[in-house]
Amino acid sequence: PARGPIVAAYGQETAKGVSAKGISIKTRSEAQVVSPFDGTVIFAGPFRGYGNIIIIEHGEHYMSLLAGLNSIDCEVGQMLLAGEPIGQMPKSAEAKLYVELREDSRPIDPEAWFAK
């Protein structure tokens, strides 16, 4: 969904002492974020402590959640193709995109899917 190194792995212990349900990717400042797979946007906007997030339903019980965006360039109900631009990261040297992949609402390790 964005270029950059993974700086926090799935299952890695967070600062709060819990296992991460997704991965964090360090991106360049103002990097473009794209849809990881084909799907339909089911949520796009600010959410609790996550800032701007996008949730995409991919079918067959899979969905992805992307958080940490500065701006969102898609809307609820929009159908997306893999690689289609959906948002932009903040203007910051420390920009990090948080990505979760879920199957039947359970988090799964997204790294193997993104390597395909």
Over which residues does each language-model region extend?
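Short, acidic/hydrophobic/Gly-rich beta-strand patch recurrent on exposed beta strands
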Residues: 23-26, 53-58, 98-101
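Extracytoplasmic/periplasmic cell wall- or extracellular glycan-interacting regions that localize
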Residues: 1-48, 108-116
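Zn2+-dependent peptidoglycan hydrolase active-site motif and core
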Residues: 35-70
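Residue-level "contact hotspot" at macromolecular interaction interfaces
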Residues: 32-35, 73, 79
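Short alpha-helix capping/helix-loop boundary micro-motifs
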Residues: 26-27, 66, 71-74
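Short beta-alpha junctions and helix-cap segments that line functional grooves
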Residues: 20-21, 68-69, 85, 96
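Periplasm/extracytoplasmic soluble domains of Gram-negative envelope assemblies
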Residues: 29-31, 60-61, 94
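Conserved, short, structured surface segments that act as functional micro-motifs
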Residues: 76-116
